[in-house]
Swiss-Prot record:
List of residues that carry Diphosphoserine: S51
Localization per Swiss-Prot or TrEMBL: Cytoplasm, Cytoskeleton; Cytoplasm
SUPFAM superfamilies per record: WD40 repeat-like
Biased composition (Basic and acidic residues): 1-13, 20-43, 190-214
Protein name: Cytoplasmic dynein 1 intermediate chain 2
Mutagenesis or variant effect for P516A: In NEDMIBA; likely benign; can rescue neurodevelopmental defects in zebrafish morphants
Name of the gene encoding the protein in the UniProt record: DYNC1I2
Gene Ontology biological process terms from the UniProt entry: microtubule-based movement; transport along microtubule
Organism: Homo sapiens
Assembly and binders: Homodimer. The cytoplasmic dynein 1 complex consists of two catalytic heavy chains (HCs) and a number of non-catalytic subunits presented by intermediate chains (ICs), light intermediate chains (LICs) and light chains (LCs); the composition seems to vary in respect to the IC, LIC and LC composition. The heavy chain homodimer serves as a scaffold for the probable homodimeric assembly of the respective non-catalytic subunits. The ICs and LICs bind directly to the HC dimer and the LCs assemble on the IC dimer. Interacts with DYNLT3. Interacts with DYNLT1.
Amino acid sequence: MSDKSELKAELERKKQRLAQIREEKKRKEEERKKKETDQKKEAVAPVQEESDLEKKRREAEALLQSMGLTPESPIVFSEYWVPPPMSPSSKSVSTPSEAGSQDSGDGAVGSRTLHWDTDPSVLQLHSDSDLGRGPIKLGMAKITQVDFPPREIVTYTKETQTPVMAQPKEDEEEDDDVVAPKPPIEPEEEKTLKKDEENDSKAPPHELTEEEKQQILHSEEFLSFFDHSTRIVERALSEQINIFFDYSGRDLEDKEGEIQAGAKLSLNRQFFDERWSKHRVVSCLDWSSQYPELLVASYNNNEDAPHEPDGVALVWNMKYKKTTPEYVFHCQSAVMSATFAKFHPNLVVGGTYSGQIVLWDNRSNKRTPVQRTPLSAAAHTHPVYCVNVVGTQNAHNLISISTDGKICSWSLDMLSHPQDSMELVHKQSKAVAVTSMSFPVGDVNNFVVGSEEGSVYTACRHGSKAGISEMFEGHQGPITGIHCHAAVGAVDFSHLFVTSSFDWTVKLWTTKNNKPLYSFEDNADYVYDVMWSPTHPALFACVDGMGRLDLWNLNNDTEVPTASISVEGNPALNRVRWTHSGREIAVGDSEGQIVIYDVGEQIAVPRNDEWARFGRTLAEINANRADAEEEAATRIPA
């Protein structure tokens, strides 16, 4: 590195020397031109003086003519008169001898010679007695004054806007050379400078030693630069633009049927990393509320790679067509749940199998957690399957629940000790083994949880009835997913929630009744997750162990799903998450792959009457359930 800097310094010194030589040549040339100009001025000076005299004479003649006098008319001033100008042939120039003889005459006034300037021409003054003419009488003359207004000069300005062309300094110097050419450098000096520059350019770069290379590779500045730059380069290389897209719509003729159906699911993206995703199970998915294109996915341990970290959380980017994760985080315990910290766009929260809550920060160059909760009785000691940030910008908490029924409330600024903790116990019996949790929209106190024994519970965090409130029975297997109604509209459906279970069913519930409103039984395997659409009131999605994604629009049909698609290879789908816009949906499988699907507009975007239609659908469901209960009641006595 030092040799390279010395070469650069030597080249700069030579360039400065070349500039000094050019400046010296330019100064000498200017001095030479100045001397030549002075000599020319001295040679032209007499001619200019003569021309000035002629100009003065013409002005005098013009003045006399304006007064009514002609140059031929002599003007008498006392005893002298001025003759008109004579031709060079008729001029009489008196010599000193003649002057002397005239002065020695009989007392007459002799001729006098008047020298106006250095010009050899002479004006002679004669007495009146020599020519015998009398004096001329002068009189007053009328003067007519004429004013000529100055010529009016009309100007206008015209401007044209042109783009500014930024030129480097070298180009500006070249332009200056074109306008004012510099004196050429002597061939010998120019050749010497060119040879030096060529030698400097051809000089081989300094070869770094292995120790220097390792020092650079492990420096903090290089790691930060490399991490940032590779992310940008990957985005640029992964972009694929369809240059053959036809805006006239001819390309869509073959897809006319699908467009009219509007309920098709189309593949958008697939996320998979050979090192961090292979042989790992996707345990949780979550979309960022600050950056909607970012998706965090948590992964279980890889049994085929015992030396790799057990827990991994990858942040994927939907905006760019890159195949690698935006961020890679890991810890020493399998990550069972993960979420973006709402109101903190740089933080990712994870719940681990060991019971620790870990916190990653994408502003840090470390892939390991920047904070973690202690492994003590004050916190969790069982697997944490549920983490969620609830509250507002100025008052929010991290809520976590472990499988031993313990719920803790944390401040993201301090994870050393929970702010509040509570045991979820139903009627003083054993603790509830929570597997899933969901908060209604806008509620931070009341929530619902699913358990391993198949029961669903409502609970609250504060108040006189803190803890488990009611129990809902209906599933015949462990609850795998639970989600409260999320679409906000003209009618409030926040009392509704759906659950999925190992009993191959999805059930619709209301907090107003401890029996399920409806049971969706179209699946032939475990249903691992379920989620309401964030924008459509009657739409929810579920995934099962056969690799099938189902979309149910209850306003259209309650017996069969509105749209279904199976992932290639039919891996078990563990998690499903809608984007905040409701136009895309992400699913994670048991092989570590994440698939993003685009949802058709006619099924994803609700019409204005969807809330009213869903209200009528619920009324029909309640009526059918009441009829079924009455029929069952009549059959029991028989």
